[in-house]
């Protein structure tokens, strides 16, 4: 029995928690810190449920069993938006009545104003009108926020420009079109305009360059939203904006969201959709506005020539298939059931399997490669006909036999197939049949021609027809078969993409490149001369063939099939199709979406696919403004695949309507207390905006709108061009890096992001407070043990004894060899007061020559003290301590002659900083610095011993005129390791003008 345990709530941290405790955060929580949750708060409630487990006889749970499972519930809430709202317009939203008010459009618009909506409605039912209405209202509701419409192609962008500007009346002065690759004035355009029509790639690039601030976006419209999968620009665009802005509206438009439920869920997740508005042609609120579409499905059998070829190929490939089945690399089937896609998948699995020996791996690969080629032959035979098969087979046959004859290939399996006598006989028959001018390589061609002839006989003169096929070879064959009818009423043309057609295997070129090359200069020259001659001959033949094609009616289609159609050629063909110069367009997949082809009355699908999206897009090209007809030609198992795909799509639509998807909650943007009411209003369009509705060509629409936005519609007098100057070009602005709110910029050390804990005696975790900066608590004291030491010899007077330093401590003076009281103890800290300085009141006796006695005797000098070092309280050794400081002889000598019992010389000067000056004599000072450097790598405290001949302590005077010699050991300085770690390096010290004095005193 399931038991519900007490649940716990976990709140995802906000951005301002970046400096908080990070030790207990999960990966998801850390990732959420990197996102800018501007006004979004996410709470996760985790509920644990017990699950039944197995127990032993003693009722103990058996090992390796899970005793519970967790159920996570996420609650998302939003705060006020960061956009500046126009309060006076929030009470209402405008619904244009310039066109007929349709209930489904009305409902979708109201929903899209307050939620992120995926609008999936049939082609031609007004998706652009819905987008324009939503754009209009957010233009009114906000003061300066950006509204962006994105589409993958220029024609789709042009359609939206016409719909938006021609319906909503948004002024040109606030709109911009960004389609070209030029980045000139792009930053100024983003700053000055509010409504943008562009492609997702342009927006993505400008966001990454820092030209567009993602926080300014309040509405993003995405057309053809079914592309928002994988790494497409739509996905990257929304990801980038979500990092900085969660308070924006997203409207996605498409006719088919995806082919399966997993694909729809991916689109929903990538675009953060909170609701799907789905309509079909059979929906009650849409059916009344749909034009009638008569759909006819025709099953066509195979001609005898095709059946014979299928049978003979099966006989030739049977031994190879049987071997593959025995090896276990292909499932058992009949030869005519070989599938190219299945064979290709199996070959990829074998290549990626490291456990198979290399020799066996490549043997199996070549077998499956041959089966895949045979699968392509079968598909071309059944769906496209004898000509498509013959061209493919002849290319593969020529390539293999050439390489095999030159011993560049040793594939005996493929050799047995291609050199099969039965196959050679069949190919010869195919060649003879294809040379007959009126021979139809597939029965589909005959049905297609009959359908076109009947349609244009009865249809009006302005009728148009489109034929869809996947292969370019098939498209050209269809154009030629229509041309053979010699019917003036049928004027076909091919319509394909920009890519060049695949070149067939050139036997002559391959042989010439792989034959033995002479090593002599003469042989090399002959080879180069021969290559040039062959290239010139090929060039001449191509020019001759092109000249011959221009004399035929299908010449332009043949040329397009070889070299592809660039955008200029595509535009011209579409323009001629709209004008009626061509009334039959034979398209590949390029004509399925993204092009404004115009009104079409007849659609013929020469082949079909297993993708419902492609099938729906093809059929959606007709029946937009008037009734249309759809003819589907099937052969082989095409009908089964088509019906299965459409049934799966219907099941998908049912699953979507029954809430089988997980949605993301979106920000309402408007305040909760604002409930705008609908105002149906007829919008008066300005003459400039209305002019765009009269344009048909997409490029003309874009050109006109661009000129209007730039204010160049009215003719102006041409101003004389300014003379060229040598002035430097204006420097481009620096790239802007947009950051989420409340983010600490700059570099942060890793130690500052960590919290340290300690465990007390009770086992409790106690947080340690962060260490205080040394610089912050460092007392500003001066320990000037050595003042103005510039010379390392006591026999030479300092050359710079008169340096004026206002902050310089009191210097010791002597009068006939007698030290004054303050000279001796002013700088010495008292043992009773730690680091504070106290002046001793005892008198000082006149020192005897060669022996300088200091008569100060109170308290036991061995008493140890603690003094504040600037960072922490550390114990210091007394004068009599022998913990690796001074030898016994040095201690006795030091205490006897120089140190009174009240004085403690364990002074650790702060070496954290020193002034930058210059030392003229460095030999002895370098020796001291080497000692400091040795201390840096040691864990203990060491003694820096300094001989009296190298430096004078402040407490000891020196009278050069007396000429006395001091044979004493100067006091040693105890320097803790902590104070040395931040000391200046030797190079800085050697450049110190005032020498070691400031190094020890600062």
UniProtKB/Swiss-Prot annotation:
Domain named Helicase C-terminal is located at 506-669
The segment(s) forming the Helicase ATP-binding domain are 108-275
Instruction: Look up the record and give one Gene Ontology term from the biological process aspect.
Output: interstrand cross-link repair
One GO MF term on file is: ATP binding
What is an example of a Pfam family matching this protein? Helicase_C
Q: Where does the UniProt annotation locate this protein?
A: Nucleus
EC number assigned by the record = 3.6.4.12
Q: Which UniProt keywords apply?
A: ATP-binding, DNA damage, DNA repair, DNA-binding, Helicase, Hydrolase, Nucleotide-binding, Nucleus
Amino acid composition bias (Basic and acidic residues), ranges on this chain: 531-551
Q: Which Gene Ontology terms of cellular component type are present?
A: nucleus
Annotated region (Disordered), positions in chain:
531-569, 799-843
Q: Which domain of life is it from?
A: Eukaryota
* Catalyzed reactions: ATP + H2O = ADP + phosphate + H(+)
Q: Where does ATP bind?
A: 121-128
Bias class Polar residues marks the residues at 553-568
**Alphabetized InterPro entries for the sequence:** DEAD/DEAH_box_helicase_dom, FANCM/Mph1-like_ID, FANCM_DEXDc, Helicase_ATP-bd, Helicase_C-like, P-loop_NTPase
PANTHER family xref list: FANCONI ANEMIA GROUP M FANCM FAMILY MEMBER, FANCONI ANEMIA GROUP M PROTEIN
Q: What does this protein do?
A: ATP-dependent DNA helicase involved in DNA damage repair by homologous recombination and in genome maintenance. Capable of unwinding D-loops. Plays a role in limiting crossover recombinants during mitotic DNA double-strand break (DSB) repair. Component of a FANCM-MHF complex which promotes gene conversion at blocked replication forks, probably by reversal of the stalled fork.
Q: How does it assemble?
A: Interacts with the MHF histone-fold complex to form the FANCM-MHF complex.
Family the entry assigns: Belongs to the DEAD box helicase family. DEAH subfamily. FANCM sub-subfamily.
The entry's protein name is: ATP-dependent DNA helicase MPH1
Q: Which organism is it from?
A: Kluyveromyces lactis (strain ATCC 8585 / CBS 2359 / DSM 70799 / NBRC 1267 / NRRL Y-1140 / WM37)
């Amino acid at each position: 029995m399931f038991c519900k345990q007490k649940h716990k709530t976990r709140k995802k941290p906000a951005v301002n928690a970046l400096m908080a405790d990070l030790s207990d955060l999960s990966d998801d929580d850390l990732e959420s810190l990197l996102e800018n949750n501007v006004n979004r708060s996410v709470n996760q409630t985790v509920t644990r449920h017990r699950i039944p487990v197995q127990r032993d006889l003693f009722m103990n749970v058996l090992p390796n069993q899970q005793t519970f499972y967790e159920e996570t519930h996420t609650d998302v809430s939003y705060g006020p938006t960061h956009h500046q709202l126009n309060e006076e317009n929030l009470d209402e939203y405008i619904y244009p009545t310039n066109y007929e008010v349709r209930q489904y459009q009305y409902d979708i618009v109201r929903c899209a104003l307050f939620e992120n909506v995926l609008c999936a409605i049939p082609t031609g039912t007004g998706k652009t009108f819905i987008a324009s209405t939503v754009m209009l209202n957010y233009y009114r509701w906000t003061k300066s926020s950006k509204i962006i419409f994105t589409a993958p192609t220029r024609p789709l962008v042009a359609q939206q420009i016409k719909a938006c500007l021609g319906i909503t009346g948004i002024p040109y002065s606030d709109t911009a079109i960004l389609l070209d690759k030029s980045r000139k004035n792009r930053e100024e355009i983003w700053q000055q305009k509010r409504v943008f029509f562009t492609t997702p790639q342009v927006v993505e690039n400008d966001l990454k360059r820092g030209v567009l601030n993602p926080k300014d976006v309040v509405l993003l419209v995405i057309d053809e939203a079914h592309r928002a999968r994988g790494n497409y620009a739509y996905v990257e665009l929304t990801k980038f904006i979500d990092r900085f802005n969660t308070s924006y509206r997203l409207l996605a438009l498409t006719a088919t969201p995806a082919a399966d439920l997993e694909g729809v869920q991916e689109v929903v997740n990538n675009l953060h959709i909170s609701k799907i508005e789905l309509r079909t042609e059979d929906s009650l609120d849409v059916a009344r506005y749909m034009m009638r579409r008569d759909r006819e499905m025709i099953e066509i059998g195979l001609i005898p020539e095709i059946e014979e070829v299928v049978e003979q190929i099966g006989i030739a490939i049977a031994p190879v298939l049987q071997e593959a089945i025995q090896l276990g690399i292909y499932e058992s089937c009949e030869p005519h059931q070989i599938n190219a896609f299945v064979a290709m998948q199996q070959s990829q699995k074998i290549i990626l399997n490291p456990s198979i020996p290399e020799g066996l791996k490549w043997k199996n690969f070549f077998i499956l490669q041959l089966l895949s080629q045979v699968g392509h032959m079968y598909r071309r035979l059944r769906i496209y006909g004898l000509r498509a098969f013959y061209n493919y087979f002849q290319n593969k046959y020529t390539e293999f036999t050439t390489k095999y004859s030159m011993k560049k290939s040793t594939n005996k399996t493929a050799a047995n197939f291609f050199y099969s006598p039965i196959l050679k006989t069949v190919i010869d028959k195919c060649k003879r049949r294809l040379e007959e001018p009126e021979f139809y390589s597939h029965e589909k061609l005959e049905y297609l021609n009959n359908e076109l002839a009947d349609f244009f006989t009865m249809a009006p003169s302005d009728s148009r027809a489109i034929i869809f096929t996947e292969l370019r070879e098939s498209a050209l064959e269809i154009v030629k078969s229509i041309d053979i009818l010699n019917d003036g009423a049928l004027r076909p043309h091919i319509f394909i993409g920009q890519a060049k057609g695949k070149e067939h295997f050139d036997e002559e070129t391959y042989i010439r490149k792989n034959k033995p090359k002479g090593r002599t200069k003469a042989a090399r020259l002959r080879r180069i001369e021969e290559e040039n001659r062959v290239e010139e001959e090929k060039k001449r033949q191509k020019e001759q063939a092109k000249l011959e094609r221009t004399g035929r009616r299908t010449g332009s289609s043949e040329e397009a099939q070889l070299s592809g159609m660039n955008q200029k050629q595509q535009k011209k063909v579409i323009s001629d199709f709209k004008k009626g110069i061509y009334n039959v367009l034979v398209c590949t997949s390029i004509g399925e979406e993204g092009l404004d082809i115009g009104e079409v009355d007849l659609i013929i699908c020469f082949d079909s696919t297993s993708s419902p999206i492609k099938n729906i897009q093809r059929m959606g090209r007709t029946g937009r403004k008037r009734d249309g007809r759809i003819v589907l030609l099937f052969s082989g198992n095409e009908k089964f695949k088509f019906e299965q795909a459409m049934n799966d799509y219907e099941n998908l639509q049912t699953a979507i309507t029954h809430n089988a998807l997980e949605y993301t909650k979106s920000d309402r943007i408007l305040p909760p207390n604002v409930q705008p009411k609908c105002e149906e209003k007829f919008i008066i369009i300005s003459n400039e905006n209305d002019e765009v509705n009269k344009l048909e060509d997409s490029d003309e629409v874009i050109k006109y709108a661009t000129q209007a936005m730039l204010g160049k519609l009215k003719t102006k007098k041409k101003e004389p061009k300014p003379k060229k100057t040598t002035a430097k070009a204006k420097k481009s602005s620096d790239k802007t890096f947009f950051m989420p709110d409340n983010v600490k910029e700059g570099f942060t050390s890793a130690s500052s992001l960590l919290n340290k804990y300690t465990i007390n005696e009770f086992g409790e975790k106690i947080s340690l407070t962060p260490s205080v900066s040394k610089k912050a608590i460092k007392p500003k004291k001066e320990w000037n043990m050595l003042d103005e030491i510039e010379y390392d010899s006591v026999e030479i007077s300092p050359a710079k004894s008169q340096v004026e330093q206002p902050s310089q401590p009191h210097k010791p003076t002597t009068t006939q060899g007698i030290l004054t009281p303050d000279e001796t103890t002013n700088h010495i800290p008292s043992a009773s007061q730690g680091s504070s300085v106290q002046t001793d009141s005892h008198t000082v006796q006149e020192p005897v020559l060669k022996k300088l006695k200091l008569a100060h005797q109170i308290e036991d000098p061995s008493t140890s003290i603690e003094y504040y070092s600037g960072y922490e309280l550390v114990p210091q050794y007394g004068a009599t301590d022998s913990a690796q400081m001074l030898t016994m002889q040095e201690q006795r000598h030091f205490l006897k002659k120089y140190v009174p019992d009240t004085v403690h010389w364990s002074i650790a000067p702060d070496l954290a900083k020193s002034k930058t000056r210059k030392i003229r004599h460095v030999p002895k000072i370098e020796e001291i610095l080497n000692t400091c450097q040795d201390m840096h790598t040691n864990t203990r405290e060491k003694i820096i011993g300094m001989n009296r001949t190298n430096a004078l302590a402040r407490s000891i005077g020196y009278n050069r005129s007396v000429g006395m010699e001091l044979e004493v050991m100067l006091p040693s300085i105890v320097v803790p390791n902590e104070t040395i770690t931040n000391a200046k390096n030797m190079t800085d010290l050697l450049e110190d003008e005032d020498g070691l004095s400031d190094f020890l005193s600062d």
